[in-house]
Amino acid sequence: MPVERMRMRPWLEEQINSNTIPGLKWLNKEKKIFQIPWMHAARHGWDVEKDAPLFRNWAIHTGKHQPGIDKPDPKTWKANFRCAMNSLPDIEEVKDRSIKKGNNAFRVYRMLPLSERPSKKGKKPKTEKEERVKHIKQEPVESSLGLSNGVSDLSPEYAVLASTIKTEVDSTVNIIVVGQSHLDSNIEDQEIVTNPPDICQVVEVTTESDDQPVSMSELYPLQISPVSSYAESETTDSVPSDEEGAEGRPHWRKRNFEGKQFLSNMGTRSTYLLPSMATFVTSNKPDLQVTIKEESCPMPYNSSWPPFTDLSLPAPVTPTPSSSRPDRETRASVIKKTSDITQSRVKSC
């Protein structure tokens, strides 16, 4: 709990009336004007008992200094006393009568009556504050009420219809229709659109026709592939016809190989189109075809394969200068044979 003590103004009046402090006196007791000795501690002839007893008494009164225990500190006493005097609202300094320099420096103060006391700084009457707060609070409330129904400039007649508003929800737009229960038939129905529809952006994709020439420097345009014929056949014609079945069946033929007869279907198969390639090629490009060639020497299916050692693979021909030598040798042998034949004919004759 804080120590109860006398306030500064009555305590100061008591110190002045005691006449125990030299230099502290009334200049005009009726107007409550008094002076306080204010000599600087650095001045020659300054004395604690003569120039600082008032400041020491205030430090003792406030509990900042205890005689015999604390070390004397006149500068701190004077600073605390000056701060306390400046904080009082009912005491002001008479600066035109004060002398702050010299050995006889002093300050003159005046105690103000209740009628002249100014109001505390930073505080305003409660009435003004309350009016401001009410004014600020009412503005947003009124604005929200005006905009809640969608239209702010409606006549008082429409205010009655606030309870009769019915909401109809469409598939795309929410529309509020005001009823006609309390108005005459002359007033037309009003529709207030609360949620307008969103604006959609339409994007068109165009493709170039096949007839237009396309340069190699340009990028390929967006092309839509035609429907696959294979897919159409799967969806439309699920059951093949007799002709298609006949075309798809292999034709077996009898063949002889090394005195053995066997059936072979080689060479009878027709060419087929890849069913799924129709979706990847356009009309101006040839379709990709797959053909099956007939083997030159087919083998029967029931015969065994010859050993790999008997198979002689032709050696790869490398273009070297020595490749022309066999041709020269064969030519020389032919010439030699012809010469031998001619000689034999000559001898026989």
Curated annotation (Swiss-Prot):
<dbReference type="GO" id="GO:0002376">
    <property type="term" value="P:immune system process"/>
</dbReference>
<comment type="function">
    <text>Specifically binds to the upstream regulatory region of type I IFN and IFN-inducible MHC class I genes (the interferon consensus sequence (ICS)) and represses those genes. Also acts as an activator for several genes including H4 and IL7. Constitutively binds to the ISRE promoter to activate IL7. Involved in cell cycle regulation through binding the site II (HiNF-M) promoter region of H4 and activating transcription during cell growth. Antagonizes IRF1 transcriptional activation.</text>
</comment>
<feature type="compositionally biased region" description="Polar residues">
    <location>
        <begin position="340"/>
        <end position="349"/>
    </location>
</feature>
<keyword id="KW-0007">Acetylation</keyword>
<feature type="cross-link" description="Glycyl lysine isopeptide (Lys-Gly) (interchain with G-Cter in SUMO)">
    <location>
        <position position="293"/>
    </location>
</feature>
<protein>
    <recommendedName>
        <fullName>Interferon regulatory factor 2</fullName>
    </recommendedName>
</protein>
<keyword id="KW-0805">Transcription regulation</keyword>
<feature type="cross-link" description="Glycyl lysine isopeptide (Lys-Gly) (interchain with G-Cter in SUMO2)">
    <location>
        <position position="260"/>
    </location>
</feature>
<keyword id="KW-0804">Transcription</keyword>
<comment type="similarity">
    <text>Belongs to the IRF family.</text>
</comment>
<dbReference type="Pfam" id="PF00605">
    <property type="entry name" value="IRF"/>
</dbReference>
<feature type="modified residue" description="N6-acetyllysine">
    <location>
        <position position="75"/>
    </location>
</feature>
<keyword id="KW-1017">Isopeptide bond</keyword>
<dbReference type="GO" id="GO:0000981">
    <property type="term" value="F:DNA-binding transcription factor activity, RNA polymerase II-specific"/>
</dbReference>
<feature type="modified residue" description="N6-acetyllysine">
    <location>
        <position position="78"/>
    </location>
</feature>
<feature type="cross-link" description="Glycyl lysine isopeptide (Lys-Gly) (interchain with G-Cter in SUMO); alternate">
    <location>
        <position position="137"/>
    </location>
</feature>
<dbReference type="InterPro" id="IPR036390">
    <property type="entry name" value="WH_DNA-bd_sf"/>
</dbReference>
<dbReference type="GO" id="GO:0005634">
    <property type="term" value="C:nucleus"/>
</dbReference>
<feature type="cross-link" description="Glycyl lysine isopeptide (Lys-Gly) (interchain with G-Cter in SUMO)">
    <location>
        <position position="166"/>
    </location>
</feature>
<keyword id="KW-0597">Phosphoprotein</keyword>
<feature type="cross-link" description="Glycyl lysine isopeptide (Lys-Gly) (interchain with G-Cter in SUMO2); alternate">
    <location>
        <position position="137"/>
    </location>
</feature>
<keyword id="KW-0678">Repressor</keyword>
<keyword id="KW-0010">Activator</keyword>
<keyword id="KW-0539">Nucleus</keyword>
<feature type="region of interest" description="Disordered">
    <location>
        <begin position="301"/>
        <end position="349"/>
    </location>
</feature>
<dbReference type="InterPro" id="IPR036388">
    <property type="entry name" value="WH-like_DNA-bd_sf"/>
</dbReference>
<dbReference type="InterPro" id="IPR017431">
    <property type="entry name" value="IRF1/IRF2"/>
</dbReference>
<dbReference type="InterPro" id="IPR019817">
    <property type="entry name" value="Interferon_reg_fac_CS"/>
</dbReference>
<comment type="subunit">
    <text>Interacts with BRD7, IRF2BP1 and IRF2BP2. Interacts with CREBBP in growing cells; the interaction acetylates IRF2 and regulates IRF2-dependent H4 promoter activity.</text>
</comment>
<feature type="region of interest" description="Disordered">
    <location>
        <begin position="228"/>
        <end position="254"/>
    </location>
</feature>
<keyword id="KW-0238">DNA-binding</keyword>
<dbReference type="GO" id="GO:0000978">
    <property type="term" value="F:RNA polymerase II cis-regulatory region sequence-specific DNA binding"/>
</dbReference>
<feature type="DNA-binding region" description="IRF tryptophan pentad repeat">
    <location>
        <begin position="5"/>
        <end position="113"/>
    </location>
</feature>
<dbReference type="InterPro" id="IPR001346">
    <property type="entry name" value="Interferon_reg_fact_DNA-bd_dom"/>
</dbReference>
<feature type="compositionally biased region" description="Polar residues">
    <location>
        <begin position="228"/>
        <end position="239"/>
    </location>
</feature>
<keyword id="KW-0832">Ubl conjugation</keyword>
<feature type="modified residue" description="Phosphoserine">
    <location>
        <position position="225"/>
    </location>
</feature>
